[in-house]
Amino acid sequence: FQSDKHLDPATGLFTEGGFAGVEHYLYWLTNRCMTASGEVGACPAGVLATDFWPSVSVTLFFTVVTVALETVLGIGMALVMNHPSRVRSLIRAAVLIPWAIPTAVTAKLWQFMFAPSGIVNSLLGHNIAWTTDPWAARFAVIIADVWKTTPFMALLILAGLQMIPRDVYEAARVDGASSLQTFTRITLPLVRPALMVAILFRTLDALRMYDLPVIMISGSSNSPTATISQLVVEDMRQGNFNSASALSTLIFLLIFTVAFVMIRFLGADVGGRQASKSMKGTR
């Protein structure tokens, strides 16, 4: 709630900022800036505030798409890792390798693969500008993020699968339930608490995404893959620590709202009640 330091045109010295109220929040939310004449007007092009809502859209787009893909792929990987086999331990170790690799290394790896002369364009037979075309760059980041964090989802879902008693599946087999019926009426309801925890963790992590798009594509605030976290870092680099703190508060409120909605309406308690109902329906 404090103004940032600014240069006094009369003395040429930096002066301390005073109480700003909600000025910083209005700066980000409404793109309103103080003009040279002291009036408040629309921020000109190039000001960070003009990139706020585009970065919010990009962040939410990344979150929805990556979490959805990682959930579907994570369930499949967890089912494979939970299936009894001689190489189950080897499969589990191999699946977790992408998650164990540092994000910076992952970003550079995929950056090389998506280069104009990289392996991706060679396999596709087309010269796609993955790092400059807006939508191609976004999908490149999504692919890299899904490859990196799907094992995390699979690990949490696997923990839920291992909590399901084996005799439940035996009873379903005796009753003549098909594989699809077993999955939809037993596996999915009983694993839902762990699944919702995995989705919650990944959603919160995706909302604060920063290093992957910065290293792969660009750290600029007007990049097609710029997230909200990038604006915070860029604002701090310009010395605007108070407005950057206000933006960090807005990010916190966004993450808190998403977490509250997911816990309140899609929490483990709801999943547990639905799971018990599903178990009664299979008997």
Q: Which role does the model predict for each range below?
A:
Residues 1-283:
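A structural signal for multi-pass alpha-helical bundles of membrane permease subunits
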